């Protein structure tokens, strides 16, 4: 199975978590497309991206959560790449049946993503537009998401994850990636 990670991180060189997780992906022979490196101007070549997708069996969209959404380059990539005839519409052949999952890093604590938490919404609710698009509109084989939660105390001010937390998260991410091609279930949500 040929697997591809679409990395949408605006500053991967200074990332601790996403950079560490890419090492796990490399160990499992995942190809990586770094959108910020490929498209520094932000202008996505949709035809090129569709060709790359066709060469892979599964996609993982990996990104840090920014303002409870994805970085702008990922939205642009989706809008430019997932077009009529490829991702949706009659005779679309690009996405139907292809495995798709998300890998999200969030600086905020897991407990804050709950109806009784600071932000009142679960990660499932925040990521629902991705599931709606990929599972129900593009008819991809939705495999769920992996989420790494941080330890933010004051919003936007002080957050960090210990080396132990990052390594534990990396091991869980590796397991998530190994299970990506499994035939049953919707992907394990960590």
What are these regions (language model features)?
Residues 1-33, 164-168, 172-175:
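N-terminal beta1-alpha1 ligand-phosphate binding loop
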Residues 10-12, 38-40, 117-120, 151-153:
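Short histidine/acidic/glycine/proline-rich micro-motifs that form metal-
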Residues 16-20, 44, 72-76:
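Generic recognition of short, well-ordered alpha-helical segments
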Residues 22-23, 131-190:
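Glycine-rich phosphate/pyrophosphate-binding loop and the adjoining helix
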Residues 30-54:
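N-terminal beta-loop-helix "entrance" segment that forms/cooperates
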Residues 35-37, 65, 147:
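Active-site loop/turn elements of alpha/beta-hydrolase fold enzymes
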Residues 47-131:
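Helix-loop-strand module that forms the ligand-binding subsite of alpha/beta enzymes
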């Amino acid at each position: 199975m040929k697997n591809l990670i679409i990395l949408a991180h605006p500053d991967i060189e200074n990332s601790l978590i996403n950079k560490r997780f890419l090492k796990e992906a490399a160990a499992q022979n995942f190809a990586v497309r770094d959108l910020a490196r490929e498209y520094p101007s932000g202008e996505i070549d949709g035809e090129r991206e569709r060709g790359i997708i066709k060469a892979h069996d599964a996609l993982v969209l990996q990104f840090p959560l920014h303002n409870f959404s994805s970085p702008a380059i990922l939205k642009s990539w989706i809008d430019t790449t997932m077009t009529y005839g490829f991702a949706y519409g009659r005779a679309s052949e690009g996405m139907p049946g292809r495995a798709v999952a998300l890998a999200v890093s969030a600086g905020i604590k897991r407990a804050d993503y709950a109806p009784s938490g600071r932000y009142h919404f679960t990660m499932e609710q925040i990521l629902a537009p991705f599931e709606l698009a990929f599972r129900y509109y593009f008819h991809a084989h939705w495999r769920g998401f992996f989420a790494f939660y941080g330890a933010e105390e004051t919003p936007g001010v002080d957050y960090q994850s210990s080396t132990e937390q990052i390594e534990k998260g990396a091991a869980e991410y590796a397991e998530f990636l190994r299970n990506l091609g499994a035939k049953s279930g919707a992907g394990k949500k960590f």
